[in-house]
């Protein structure tokens, strides 16, 4: 099968993709439930405030996963939910004096703008929690019927999952029930055990009537953990391939999801995938700690492609330290900016030499494929990318158009997997870009280079140098090769 992501012809009979499974704490060979198809659910954002780099790292990681699986020949279905009803949304909207649904919708739009700004493609399905209340109520009813949930006896309308009724509780996180802290999601007085968590929350007098729905237990709203089990089941079925999110969701959120789904008789996810945090001064980037870097602010200083590179270049299970002072350490946004500049410089130089549109390669290098098949080994894959760029620059310098075309084709295929190809549709709407300008600028520069070549031919060195200086002052690098002069952005 040939994917439209990069053109790489991955044969499913030879795919050896390996993935770290959080549930088993080991690397496993990935085997999808349905041949040729992959189903992925990753937990979306609770739209209470602006998205920061910690949120958007997850979006980038799963976007790269999707691209690589498609590149390998799979048809991929991705579901990412939007939690648009939650305690924090109600509290923050009340403090701001805005309707809770308007508050949620505003920040949902900010989330969409953030992942679009960083070149992430939208999920196949992006369901809102509030649009799936009937499915959630049915799941709660099933759990009550099976003896794994109970309505609170205090008349609050709350319904809890009985953790003691499910012996496998704790299998994902490895935490024993007796070692767990009490669940903090509702009033403990209605619980059989402090660790029981809320499936359904009864309506409270100080909450808007519109933030509640009719249920067999009275008006109320779903608990956070319930939402994902119901929505993943609706769009992917009772069993699907990969469930993911940030590592902080492993417990209690994903543990609770797994327990309530399995207790209801659903096989649920076969692989669990978690990305590490973005940290600041060694601490997890978090709204509660007040140490966040909003995507909209960071992209005012750094190009969106540099920010995306910053988030994908380290391995997804490694922490990324964000330093607002950018002290020049490897992995900083300054280093990411230099990397993007090096990539773009090669693309410009190679395209100028080849003189025609070059498509992505249909066969990626072995080093790149091996790296990506090994649990999305982006650090090694990035190294393979820059190895191609180094060799490609050598070909440009000696004017070898055929070798340059080969390296350019490889680089474009790799950039497509990373979502970093500047000519890809997802970057077409980036602020300040206009594809119509590129041929105009290229034509003007080449006209000046032709005038310079004519001046050099008649030994008019003053004119030739003046043209070169003009182009250099405009931020261009001029390189004389046996095939003629070529330009690139400095």
Swiss-Prot record:
Protein name, please? Answer: Cysteine--tRNA ligase
Name the reaction it catalyses.
Answer: tRNA(Cys) + L-cysteine + ATP = L-cysteinyl-tRNA(Cys) + AMP + diphosphate
- In which broad location class does this protein mainly occur, judging by the first location in its UniProt entry? cytoplasm
Query: InterPro entries annotated for this entry?
Result: Cys-tRNA-ligase (IPR015803), Cys-tRNA-synt_Ia_DALR (IPR015273), Cys-tRNA/MSH_ligase (IPR024909), CysS_C (IPR056411), Rossmann-like_a/b/a_fold (IPR014729), tRNA-synt_1_cat_dom (IPR032678), tRNAsynth_Ia_anticodon-bd (IPR009080)
Q: Which organism is it from?
A: Cutibacterium acnes (strain DSM 16379 / KPA171202)
Q: List the molecular function annotations (GO) for this entry.
A: ATP binding; cysteine-tRNA ligase activity; zinc ion binding
Q: How is the cofactor bound?
A: Binds 1 zinc ion per subunit.
Entry EC number(s): 6.1.1.16
Q: Where does Zn(2+) bind?
A: 43, 228, 253, 257
Q: Where exactly are the transmembrane stretches of this chain?
A: none
Q: HAMAP family, per this entry?
A: Cys_tRNA_synth
Assembly description: Monomer.
Q: Which SMART domains does the annotation name?
A: DALR_2
Provide one Gene Ontology biological process annotation. Answer: cysteinyl-tRNA aminoacylation
Motif residue range(s): 'HIGH' region:
45-55
The source's domain of life comes to Bacteria
Basic and acidic residues composition bias: which ranges? 186-204
- Encoding gene per record: cysS
The protein's required cofactor(s) are namely:
Zn(2+)
**Binding positions for ATP?**
287
Motif 'KMSKS' region: positions? 284-288
What family does this chain come from, according to its entry? Belongs to the class-I aminoacyl-tRNA synthetase family.
């Amino acid at each position: 099968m040939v994917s439209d992501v990069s053109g790489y012809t991955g044969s499913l009979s030879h795919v050896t993709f390996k993935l770290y499974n959080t549930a088993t704490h080991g690397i496993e060979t990935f085997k999808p439930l349905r041949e040729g198809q992959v189903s992925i659910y990753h937990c979306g954002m609770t739209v209470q405030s602006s998205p920061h780099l910690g949120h958007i790292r997850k979006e980038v990681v799963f976007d790269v996963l999707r691209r690589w699986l498609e590149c390998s020949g799979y048809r991929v279905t991705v579901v990412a939910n939007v939690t648009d009803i939650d305690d924090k949304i109600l509290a923050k909207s009340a403090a701001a004096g805005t309707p809770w649904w308007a508050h949620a919708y505003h920040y949902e739009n900010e989330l969409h703008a953030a992942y679009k700004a960083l070149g992430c493609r939208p999920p196949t399905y992006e369901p809102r929690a509030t649009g799936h209340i009937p499915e959630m109520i049915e799941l709660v009813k099933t759990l009550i019927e099976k003896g794994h949930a109970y309505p609170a006896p205090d008349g609050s309308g709350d319904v809890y999952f009985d953790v003691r009724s499910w012996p496998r509780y704790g299998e994902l996180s490895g935490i024993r029930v007796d070692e767990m802290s009490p669940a903090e999601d509702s009033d403990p007085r209605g619980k059989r055990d402090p660790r029981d968590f809320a499936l359904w929350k009864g309506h409270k007098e100080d909450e808007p009537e519109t933030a509640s729905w009719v249920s067999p237990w009275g008006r109320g709203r779903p608990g956070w953990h319930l939402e994902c089990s119901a929505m993943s089941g609706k769009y992917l079925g009772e069993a699907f391939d990969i469930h993911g999110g940030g590592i902080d969701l492993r417990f209690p959120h994903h543990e609770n999801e797994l327990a309530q789904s399995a207790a209801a008789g659903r096989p649920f996810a076969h692989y669990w995938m978690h990305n590490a945090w973005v940290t600041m001064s060694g601490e997890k980037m978090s709204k509660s700690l007040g140490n966040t870097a909003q995507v909209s602010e960071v992209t005012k200083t750094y190009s969106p492609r540099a920010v995306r590179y910053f988030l994908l270049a380290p391995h997804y299970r490694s922490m990324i330290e964000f330093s607002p002072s950018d002290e020049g350490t490897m992995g900083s946004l300054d280093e990411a900016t230099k990397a993007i500049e090096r990539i773009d410089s090669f693309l410009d130089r190679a395209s100028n030499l080849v003189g025609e549109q070059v498509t992505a390669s249909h066969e990626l290098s072995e080093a790149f494929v091996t790296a990506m098949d090994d649990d999305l080994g982006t650090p090694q894959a990035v190294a393979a990318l820059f190895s191609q760029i180094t060799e490609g620059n050598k070909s440009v310098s000696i004017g070898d158009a055929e070798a340059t075309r080969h390296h350019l084709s490889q680089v474009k295929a790799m950039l497509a997997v990373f979502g970093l190809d500047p000519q890809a549709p997802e970057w077409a709407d980036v602020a300040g870009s206009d594809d119509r300008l590129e041929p105009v600028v290229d034509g003007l520069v080449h006209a000046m280079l032709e005038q310079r070549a004519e001046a050099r031919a008649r030994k008019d060195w003053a004119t030739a140098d003046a043209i070169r200086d003009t182009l250099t002052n405009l931020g261009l690098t001029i390189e004389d090769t046996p095939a003629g002069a070529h330009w690139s952005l400095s």
